[in-house]
From Swiss-Prot:
Subcellular location: Nucleus
Main location: nucleus
Effect of residue 251 to S: In AP2-1; temperature-sensitive
Protein source organism: Arabidopsis thaliana (Mouse-ear cress)
Family assignment from sequence similarity: Belongs to the AP2/ERF transcription factor family. AP2 subfamily.
Extent of motif EAR: 304-308
Protein name according to UniProt: Floral homeotic protein APETALA 2
Region Disordered, residue ranges: 1-56, 287-362, 395-432
Entries under PROSITE patterns matching the protein: AP2_ERF
The UniProt record lists the keyword Transferase: no
Length: 432
Protein backbone atom coordinates (compact mmCIF):
# COMPACT_ATOMS: atom_id res chain seq x y z
CA UNK A 1 0.00 0.00 0.00
CA UNK A 2 1.40 3.29 -0.98
CA UNK A 3 1.89 6.09 1.45
CA UNK A 4 0.52 9.19 -0.11
CA UNK A 5 2.29 11.44 2.34
CA UNK A 6 5.72 10.48 1.06
CA UNK A 7 7.26 12.04 -1.91
CA UNK A 8 7.98 9.86 -4.98
CA UNK A 9 11.66 10.76 -5.03
CA UNK A 10 12.11 9.66 -1.40
CA UNK A 11 10.61 6.24 -2.11
CA UNK A 12 12.90 5.80 -5.06
CA UNK A 13 15.95 6.64 -2.94
CA UNK A 14 14.99 4.08 -0.32
CA UNK A 15 14.63 1.36 -2.93
CA UNK A 16 18.04 2.18 -4.38
CA UNK A 17 19.68 2.03 -0.99
CA UNK A 18 18.06 -1.32 -0.30
CA UNK A 19 19.28 -2.76 -3.57
CA UNK A 20 22.77 -1.48 -2.88
CA UNK A 21 22.83 -3.24 0.48
CA UNK A 22 21.79 -6.59 -0.96
CA UNK A 23 24.06 -6.36 -3.95
CA UNK A 24 27.26 -5.82 -1.93
CA UNK A 25 28.92 -9.20 -1.22
CA UNK A 26 30.78 -8.01 1.84
CA UNK A 27 27.87 -6.51 3.71
CA UNK A 28 24.82 -7.98 5.34
CA UNK A 29 21.93 -6.31 7.07
CA UNK A 30 21.31 -7.24 10.64
CA UNK A 31 17.90 -5.53 10.88
CA UNK A 32 15.81 -3.58 8.41
CA UNK A 33 12.92 -1.23 8.79
CA UNK A 34 11.33 1.62 6.90
CA UNK A 35 13.48 4.08 8.78
CA UNK A 36 17.00 4.38 7.38
CA UNK A 37 18.46 5.25 10.79
CA UNK A 38 17.56 1.86 12.28
CA UNK A 39 19.65 -0.24 9.91
CA UNK A 40 22.80 -1.91 11.41
CA UNK A 41 25.44 -3.00 9.00
CA UNK A 42 27.98 -5.71 10.03
CA UNK A 43 30.95 -6.18 7.81
CA UNK A 44 32.87 -9.41 7.39
CA UNK A 45 36.44 -8.30 7.03
CA UNK A 46 38.52 -9.86 4.32
CA UNK A 47 42.16 -9.44 3.35
CA UNK A 48 41.36 -7.85 -0.02
CA UNK A 49 39.03 -5.29 1.45
CA UNK A 50 41.52 -4.43 4.21
CA UNK A 51 44.28 -3.80 1.68
CA UNK A 52 42.08 -1.65 -0.56
CA UNK A 53 40.39 0.23 2.25
CA UNK A 54 41.92 3.45 3.44
CA UNK A 55 42.37 3.32 7.21
CA UNK A 56 41.37 6.35 9.25
CA UNK A 57 43.90 8.42 11.11
CA UNK A 58 42.37 7.74 14.52
CA UNK A 59 43.58 4.50 16.24
CA UNK A 60 41.13 1.63 16.53
CA UNK A 61 39.60 0.98 19.93
CA UNK A 62 37.95 -2.36 20.63
CA UNK A 63 35.08 -2.52 23.09
CA UNK A 64 33.66 -5.76 24.43
CA UNK A 65 29.94 -5.30 24.45
CA UNK A 66 29.04 -8.73 25.82
CA UNK A 67 31.43 -9.66 28.72
CA UNK A 68 31.30 -13.24 29.95
CA UNK A 69 29.54 -13.85 33.24
CA UNK A 70 30.26 -16.68 35.66
CA UNK A 71 27.65 -19.35 35.83
CA UNK A 72 27.64 -19.08 39.65
CA UNK A 73 26.90 -15.38 39.50
CA UNK A 74 23.65 -15.98 37.69
CA UNK A 75 24.75 -14.33 34.46
CA UNK A 76 23.74 -15.68 31.08
CA UNK A 77 26.53 -16.89 28.84
CA UNK A 78 26.55 -15.20 25.49
CA UNK A 79 25.46 -17.45 22.72
CA UNK A 80 26.00 -14.89 19.98
CA UNK A 81 28.44 -15.59 17.17
CA UNK A 82 31.82 -13.96 17.31
CA UNK A 83 31.83 -10.59 15.63
CA UNK A 84 34.80 -9.24 13.72
CA UNK A 85 35.22 -5.51 13.91
CA UNK A 86 37.38 -4.25 11.08
CA UNK A 87 39.34 -7.52 10.97
CA UNK A 88 40.15 -7.64 14.71
CA UNK A 89 39.47 -11.04 16.31
CA UNK A 90 38.39 -11.39 19.90
CA UNK A 91 40.65 -14.17 21.34
CA UNK A 92 40.43 -13.23 25.02
CA UNK A 93 37.23 -15.11 25.50
CA UNK A 94 38.77 -18.24 24.03
CA UNK A 95 41.81 -18.04 26.28
CA UNK A 96 39.69 -17.42 29.31
CA UNK A 97 37.42 -20.27 28.41
CA UNK A 98 40.34 -22.64 27.82
CA UNK A 99 42.18 -21.66 30.99
CA UNK A 100 39.08 -22.04 33.11
CA UNK A 101 38.42 -25.42 31.62
CA UNK A 102 42.04 -26.47 32.26
CA UNK A 103 41.86 -25.31 35.85
CA UNK A 104 38.67 -27.18 36.38
CA UNK A 105 40.24 -30.33 34.95
CA UNK A 106 43.30 -30.04 37.21
CA UNK A 107 41.17 -29.45 40.29
CA UNK A 108 39.04 -32.44 39.46
CA UNK A 109 42.13 -34.61 38.98
CA UNK A 110 43.57 -33.42 42.27
CA UNK A 111 40.35 -34.24 44.07
CA UNK A 112 40.04 -37.67 42.50
CA UNK A 113 43.70 -38.68 43.15
CA UNK A 114 44.03 -40.08 46.70
CA UNK A 115 46.77 -38.68 48.96
CA UNK A 116 49.63 -41.15 49.36
CA UNK A 117 51.00 -41.41 52.93
CA UNK A 118 54.68 -40.49 53.27
CA UNK A 119 56.94 -43.22 54.61
CA UNK A 120 58.96 -41.96 57.53
CA UNK A 121 62.57 -43.06 57.44
CA UNK A 122 64.04 -44.55 60.60
CA UNK A 123 67.61 -43.89 59.56
CA UNK A 124 67.74 -40.17 60.22
CA UNK A 125 69.27 -37.55 57.94
CA UNK A 126 71.86 -38.51 55.39
CA UNK A 127 75.47 -37.57 55.82
CA UNK A 128 76.49 -34.31 54.20
CA UNK A 129 79.94 -35.52 53.25
CA UNK A 130 79.08 -38.93 51.80
CA UNK A 131 76.44 -40.50 49.63
CA UNK A 132 76.31 -43.51 51.95
CA UNK A 133 74.46 -43.66 55.21
CA UNK A 134 76.51 -43.82 58.39
CA UNK A 135 79.71 -42.66 56.65
CA UNK A 136 81.55 -39.39 57.27
CA UNK A 137 84.70 -38.01 55.68
CA UNK A 138 87.25 -36.29 57.92
CA UNK A 139 89.51 -33.81 56.22
CA UNK A 140 92.17 -33.83 58.92
CA UNK A 141 92.86 -37.54 58.60
CA UNK A 142 91.70 -37.95 55.00
CA UNK A 143 89.77 -41.09 55.85
CA UNK A 144 86.18 -42.33 55.85
CA UNK A 145 84.78 -43.21 59.26
CA UNK A 146 81.69 -45.25 59.98
CA UNK A 147 79.32 -44.71 62.93
CA UNK A 148 75.97 -46.10 64.02
CA UNK A 149 73.52 -44.87 66.66
CA UNK A 150 72.47 -47.31 69.36
CA UNK A 151 70.45 -46.43 72.46
CA UNK A 152 71.16 -42.73 72.03
CA UNK A 153 74.93 -43.20 71.69
CA UNK A 154 77.15 -43.03 68.64
CA UNK A 155 79.18 -46.21 68.24
CA UNK A 156 82.42 -45.96 66.31
CA UNK A 157 82.90 -48.75 63.75
CA UNK A 158 86.32 -47.87 62.34
CA UNK A 159 88.18 -45.73 59.85
CA UNK A 160 88.54 -46.83 56.24
CA UNK A 161 90.36 -45.71 53.12
CA UNK A 162 87.23 -45.70 50.91
CA UNK A 163 83.63 -44.71 51.45
CA UNK A 164 82.48 -48.06 50.05
CA UNK A 165 84.32 -50.02 52.76
CA UNK A 166 82.92 -47.75 55.48
CA UNK A 167 79.40 -48.23 54.10
CA UNK A 168 79.88 -52.00 54.19
CA UNK A 169 80.86 -51.80 57.85
CA UNK A 170 77.78 -49.72 58.62
CA UNK A 171 75.51 -52.23 56.88
CA UNK A 172 76.93 -55.12 58.89
CA UNK A 173 76.46 -53.25 62.15
CA UNK A 174 72.92 -52.17 61.21
CA UNK A 175 71.93 -55.77 60.47
CA UNK A 176 73.39 -56.89 63.80
CA UNK A 177 71.78 -54.10 65.81
CA UNK A 178 68.38 -53.79 64.07
CA UNK A 179 67.80 -57.06 62.27
CA UNK A 180 67.29 -58.02 58.65
CA UNK A 181 64.74 -55.24 58.06
CA UNK A 182 67.27 -52.50 58.83
CA UNK A 183 67.85 -49.72 56.31
CA UNK A 184 71.23 -50.35 54.69
CA UNK A 185 73.22 -49.01 51.78
CA UNK A 186 73.44 -52.21 49.72
CA UNK A 187 71.47 -55.40 49.14
CA UNK A 188 70.86 -57.78 52.03
CA UNK A 189 71.94 -60.75 49.92
CA UNK A 190 75.53 -59.50 49.99
CA UNK A 191 75.81 -60.24 53.71
CA UNK A 192 74.86 -63.91 53.92
CA UNK A 193 78.26 -64.92 55.27
CA UNK A 194 78.18 -62.12 57.83
CA UNK A 195 74.78 -63.27 59.07
CA UNK A 196 76.24 -66.65 59.96
CA UNK A 197 79.15 -65.04 61.79
CA UNK A 198 77.21 -62.48 63.79
CA UNK A 199 74.82 -65.01 65.29
CA UNK A 200 77.56 -66.30 67.60
CA UNK A 201 78.78 -62.84 68.68
CA UNK A 202 77.39 -60.13 70.88
CA UNK A 203 77.11 -56.51 69.80
CA UNK A 204 80.33 -55.52 71.53
CA UNK A 205 82.28 -58.42 70.08
CA UNK A 206 80.97 -57.78 66.58
CA UNK A 207 81.91 -54.10 66.84
CA UNK A 208 85.44 -55.14 67.82
CA UNK A 209 85.57 -57.38 64.75
CA UNK A 210 84.58 -54.46 62.52
CA UNK A 211 87.17 -52.23 64.13
CA UNK A 212 89.90 -54.79 63.57
CA UNK A 213 88.96 -54.86 59.90
CA UNK A 214 89.46 -51.11 59.68
CA UNK A 215 92.79 -49.49 58.92
CA UNK A 216 94.25 -48.71 62.35
CA UNK A 217 93.06 -46.23 64.91
CA UNK A 218 90.43 -43.61 64.18
CA UNK A 219 92.75 -40.64 64.73
CA UNK A 220 96.06 -42.42 64.15
CA UNK A 221 98.62 -41.11 61.72
CA UNK A 222 100.03 -44.48 60.65
CA UNK A 223 98.86 -46.83 57.95
CA UNK A 224 99.66 -49.88 60.08
CA UNK A 225 97.26 -51.44 62.53
CA UNK A 226 98.00 -50.80 66.19
CA UNK A 227 100.58 -48.08 65.48
CA UNK A 228 100.32 -44.39 66.25
CA UNK A 229 102.74 -41.48 66.45
CA UNK A 230 103.65 -40.56 70.00
CA UNK A 231 104.10 -36.95 71.07
CA UNK A 232 107.81 -37.58 71.66
CA UNK A 233 108.29 -38.29 67.96
CA UNK A 234 108.56 -42.07 68.12
CA UNK A 235 106.05 -44.71 67.02
CA UNK A 236 103.92 -46.32 69.70
CA UNK A 237 102.58 -49.86 69.39
CA UNK A 238 99.55 -50.87 71.43
CA UNK A 239 96.73 -53.34 71.29
CA UNK A 240 93.28 -52.31 72.44
CA UNK A 241 90.51 -54.11 74.31
CA UNK A 242 92.56 -56.92 75.79
CA UNK A 243 91.24 -58.78 78.85
CA UNK A 244 89.07 -55.92 80.02
CA UNK A 245 91.80 -53.29 79.73
CA UNK A 246 91.45 -50.24 77.56
CA UNK A 247 94.65 -51.03 75.68
CA UNK A 248 97.96 -52.79 76.21
CA UNK A 249 101.06 -50.70 75.74
CA UNK A 250 103.69 -52.52 73.65
CA UNK A 251 106.46 -49.92 73.56
CA UNK A 252 107.99 -47.09 71.55
CA UNK A 253 109.90 -47.74 68.34
CA UNK A 254 112.02 -45.78 65.92
CA UNK A 255 110.13 -46.84 62.77
CA UNK A 256 106.58 -47.77 61.88
CA UNK A 257 107.60 -51.21 60.65
CA UNK A 258 109.12 -52.18 64.01
CA UNK A 259 106.00 -51.04 65.82
CA UNK A 260 103.79 -52.93 63.37
CA UNK A 261 105.82 -56.11 63.87
CA UNK A 262 105.49 -55.77 67.64
CA UNK A 263 101.73 -55.45 67.26
CA UNK A 264 101.60 -58.52 65.01
CA UNK A 265 103.50 -60.65 67.52
CA UNK A 266 101.25 -59.58 70.36
CA UNK A 267 98.12 -60.21 68.29
CA UNK A 268 99.30 -63.71 67.35
CA UNK A 269 100.06 -64.51 70.99
CA UNK A 270 96.60 -63.42 72.07
CA UNK A 271 94.33 -64.46 69.20
CA UNK A 272 96.32 -67.25 67.58
CA UNK A 273 96.05 -67.97 63.87
CA UNK A 274 92.85 -65.91 63.56
CA UNK A 275 94.64 -62.69 64.50
CA UNK A 276 94.50 -59.77 62.07
CA UNK A 277 98.08 -58.66 61.41
CA UNK A 278 99.86 -56.08 59.30
CA UNK A 279 102.19 -58.57 57.62
CA UNK A 280 102.13 -62.26 56.80
CA UNK A 281 101.88 -64.24 60.06
CA UNK A 282 104.22 -66.93 58.74
CA UNK A 283 107.26 -64.65 59.09
CA UNK A 284 106.87 -64.75 62.87
CA UNK A 285 106.77 -68.54 63.24
CA UNK A 286 110.47 -68.98 63.98
CA UNK A 287 110.61 -66.17 66.54
CA UNK A 288 107.46 -67.29 68.32
CA UNK A 289 108.57 -70.92 68.39
CA UNK A 290 111.96 -69.94 69.82
CA UNK A 291 110.33 -67.85 72.52
CA UNK A 292 107.85 -70.59 73.40
CA UNK A 293 110.60 -73.24 73.65
CA UNK A 294 112.92 -71.03 75.69
CA UNK A 295 110.27 -69.49 77.96
CA UNK A 296 107.25 -71.79 78.14
CA UNK A 297 104.15 -69.93 79.14
CA UNK A 298 101.04 -71.27 80.79
CA UNK A 299 97.52 -70.43 79.66
CA UNK A 300 97.08 -68.36 82.81
CA UNK A 301 100.02 -66.11 81.96
CA UNK A 302 98.39 -63.27 80.04
CA UNK A 303 101.02 -60.62 80.75
CA UNK A 304 102.67 -59.36 77.58
CA UNK A 305 106.32 -58.39 77.31
CA UNK A 306 106.28 -54.62 77.20
CA UNK A 307 109.73 -54.53 75.61
CA UNK A 308 108.60 -56.86 72.85
CA UNK A 309 110.22 -55.12 69.92
CA UNK A 310 112.58 -52.61 71.49
CA UNK A 311 116.24 -52.55 70.60
CA UNK A 312 118.94 -53.98 72.90
CA UNK A 313 120.08 -50.58 74.11
CA UNK A 314 116.64 -49.46 75.12
CA UNK A 315 116.06 -52.81 76.81
CA UNK A 316 119.20 -52.51 78.94
CA UNK A 317 118.36 -48.93 79.79
CA UNK A 318 114.92 -49.90 80.98
CA UNK A 319 116.35 -52.72 83.13
CA UNK A 320 118.89 -50.36 84.71
CA UNK A 321 116.18 -47.87 85.49
CA UNK A 322 114.09 -50.57 87.13
CA UNK A 323 117.01 -51.71 89.30
CA UNK A 324 117.69 -48.15 90.40
CA UNK A 325 114.07 -47.56 91.24
CA UNK A 326 113.88 -50.75 93.30
CA UNK A 327 117.08 -49.89 95.19
CA UNK A 328 115.86 -46.38 95.96
CA UNK A 329 112.55 -47.71 97.20
CA UNK A 330 114.29 -50.19 99.51
CA UNK A 331 116.61 -47.51 100.87
CA UNK A 332 113.75 -45.14 101.53
CA UNK A 333 111.77 -47.83 103.34
CA UNK A 334 114.80 -48.77 105.48
CA UNK A 335 115.49 -45.17 106.42
CA UNK A 336 111.84 -44.60 107.33
CA UNK A 337 111.90 -47.62 109.62
CA UNK A 338 115.10 -46.41 111.31
CA UNK A 339 113.70 -42.94 111.82
CA UNK A 340 110.56 -44.40 113.31
CA UNK A 341 112.56 -46.50 115.78
CA UNK A 342 114.67 -43.50 116.78
CA UNK A 343 111.62 -41.34 117.40
CA UNK A 344 109.95 -43.99 119.54
CA UNK A 345 113.15 -44.39 121.59
CA UNK A 346 113.38 -40.66 122.21
CA UNK A 347 109.73 -40.50 123.18
CA UNK A 348 110.13 -43.37 125.64
CA UNK A 349 113.07 -41.61 127.37
CA UNK A 350 111.39 -38.29 128.12
CA UNK A 351 112.56 -36.51 131.30
CA UNK A 352 110.59 -36.87 134.52
CA UNK A 353 108.70 -33.77 135.54
CA UNK A 354 109.05 -34.49 139.30
CA UNK A 355 112.67 -33.25 139.43
CA UNK A 356 113.29 -29.91 141.12
CA UNK A 357 115.10 -27.03 139.58
CA UNK A 358 118.01 -25.35 141.37
CA UNK A 359 116.97 -22.51 143.65
CA UNK A 360 113.46 -23.76 144.10
CA UNK A 361 111.84 -24.68 147.41
CA UNK A 362 112.39 -28.17 148.78
CA UNK A 363 109.46 -30.42 148.14
CA UNK A 364 109.57 -33.94 149.48
CA UNK A 365 113.13 -35.01 150.27
CA UNK A 366 116.22 -32.80 150.20
CA UNK A 367 117.32 -29.61 148.58
CA UNK A 368 118.60 -28.69 145.17
CA UNK A 369 120.66 -30.97 143.00
CA UNK A 370 121.82 -31.26 139.40
CA UNK A 371 119.26 -31.06 136.62
CA UNK A 372 117.97 -34.48 135.45
CA UNK A 373 120.85 -36.61 136.77
CA UNK A 374 119.33 -39.98 135.89
CA UNK A 375 117.09 -39.03 133.00
CA UNK A 376 119.89 -37.25 131.16
CA UNK A 377 121.95 -40.41 131.07
CA UNK A 378 119.12 -42.30 129.50
CA UNK A 379 118.38 -39.46 127.10
CA UNK A 380 121.97 -39.13 125.95
CA UNK A 381 122.28 -42.88 125.67
CA UNK A 382 119.19 -42.88 123.47
CA UNK A 383 120.63 -40.03 121.42
CA UNK A 384 123.88 -41.88 120.97
CA UNK A 385 122.10 -45.03 119.89
CA UNK A 386 119.95 -43.01 117.54
CA UNK A 387 123.02 -41.25 116.18
CA UNK A 388 124.68 -44.59 115.54
CA UNK A 389 121.61 -45.99 113.80
CA UNK A 390 121.24 -42.90 111.65
CA UNK A 391 124.92 -43.10 110.75
CA UNK A 392 124.46 -46.67 109.57
CA UNK A 393 121.36 -45.70 107.60
CA UNK A 394 123.20 -42.81 106.00
CA UNK A 395 126.07 -45.07 105.05
CA UNK A 396 123.68 -47.58 103.46
CA UNK A 397 121.89 -44.82 101.54
CA UNK A 398 125.11 -43.46 100.07
CA UNK A 399 125.75 -40.43 102.32
CA UNK A 400 129.12 -39.91 104.04
CA UNK A 401 129.35 -39.96 107.87
CA UNK A 402 130.70 -36.41 107.86
CA UNK A 403 127.59 -35.22 106.05
CA UNK A 404 125.40 -37.05 108.54
CA UNK A 405 127.20 -35.46 111.51
CA UNK A 406 126.53 -32.04 110.09
CA UNK A 407 122.85 -32.85 109.78
CA UNK A 408 122.70 -34.25 113.31
CA UNK A 409 124.50 -31.25 114.80
CA UNK A 410 122.18 -28.87 113.00
CA UNK A 411 119.19 -30.72 114.43
CA UNK A 412 120.55 -30.72 118.01
CA UNK A 413 121.58 -27.06 118.04
CA UNK A 414 118.14 -25.54 118.81
CA UNK A 415 117.76 -27.63 121.97
CA UNK A 416 121.15 -26.54 123.33
CA UNK A 417 120.47 -22.93 122.50
CA UNK A 418 117.18 -23.09 124.38
CA UNK A 419 118.92 -24.41 127.52
CA UNK A 420 121.61 -21.72 127.41
CA UNK A 421 119.08 -18.98 126.78
CA UNK A 422 117.01 -19.97 129.83
CA UNK A 423 120.03 -20.15 132.17
CA UNK A 424 120.42 -23.90 132.36
CA UNK A 425 123.69 -25.70 131.99
CA UNK A 426 123.90 -29.21 130.67
CA UNK A 427 124.82 -31.71 133.40
CA UNK A 428 128.26 -33.16 133.59
CA UNK A 429 128.61 -36.81 132.79
CA UNK A 430 130.18 -38.93 135.51
CA UNK A 431 133.29 -40.75 134.42
CA UNK A 432 132.69 -44.46 134.22
Amino acid sequence: MWDLNDAPHQTQREEESEEFCYSSPSKRVGSFSNSSSSAVVIEDGSDDDELNRVRPNNPLVTHQFFPEMDSNGGGVASGFPRAHWFGVKFCQSDLATGSSAGKATNVAAAVVEPAQPLKKSRRGPRSRSSQYRGVTFYRRTGRWESHIWDCGKQVYLGGFDTAHAAARAYDRAAIKFRGVEADINFNIDDYDDDLKQMTNLTKEEFVHVLRRQSTGFPRGSSKYRGVTLHKCGRWEARMGQFLGKKYVYLGLFDTEVEAARAYDKAAIKCNGKDAVTNFDPSIYDEELNAESSGNPTTPQDHNLDLSLGNSANSKHKSQDMRLRMNQQQQDSLHSNEVLGLGQTGMLNHTPNSNHQFPGSSNIGSGGGFSLFPAAENHRFDGRASTNQVLTNAAASSGFSPHHHNQIFNSTSTPHQNWLQTNGFQPPLMRPS
